[in-house]
Amino acid sequence: MKTKQHKTPRIIIVTTPLREEPSDFPPIGSLSVITRLKQAGFGDTHFYNIDLLRPTFEETIAYLKKEKPDILGISAVVSTAYAFTKKLSFAVREVLPKTTIFLGGNLGASAEIILKKTSVDYICTGEGEKTAVDFVCRWLTANTKNDFSDVKGLSFLDENGQLIVTPDPEPISKEEVYDIDWSILDDLGQISTYVTRADSTAIDHSFGHDPRRLDTHRK
């Protein structure tokens, strides 16, 4: 493996279709990771919300082929995204053989299966905000897969095909969980306004989708 020596790699983060009907609810995980990457100086980072836009598979591949990302991040937040992720990774590998494919989300719990049965190269095993930034920083200088062993929160197959799972990074603080650059969606014309009653019960329900809110250190 030899990565391209870019000062700023081109990165595209994509979602996967979650349900039969598209949803305009903001994809918090993807947005949070993109925010952190941009803050770290990786300004050539872009978002393709497949779950909302619902392009055909052919349109998705055509878009990625045109954009030529150096790193493709797949946000797979549900286990049912496996079939789509597998199909997407193989198709991308065929048309963009030099693109590094990085996966995050709950599907990463099945890291060994994904790494051995798909064309995904690396998996974020926990929170992606720190891992994604550290991963891209290491990508800039790595010569082999083994060079990624110091990136926390990462899973991959080394040069000998052995599964490597690195330690988790320190969790982000409660203040950072929703520290998101909402202009990412606004610039794409994909932002929606969510209004709720001004009481704690409603607010807890509205933002109750992220299990990290239950962590003791974030209460």
What positions do the PLM features span?
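N-terminal cofactor/phosphate-binding cores enriched in small/glycine residues
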Residues: 33
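Glycine- and acidic-residue-enriched helix-capping/strand-helix junction motifs
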Residues: 19-30
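Short boundary motifs at domain starts and secondary-structure transition points
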Residues: 1-6
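Short hydrophobic segments within beta-strands
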Residues: 14-17, 48, 75, 104, ...
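Radical SAM [4Fe-4S] cluster-binding motif and immediate context
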Residues: 180-219
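Nucleotide-activated donor-dependent transferases that construct or modify glycoconjugates
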Residues: 9-21, 72
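Glycine-rich beta-alpha loop elements in corrinoid/cobalamin-binding modules
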Residues: 36, 44-174
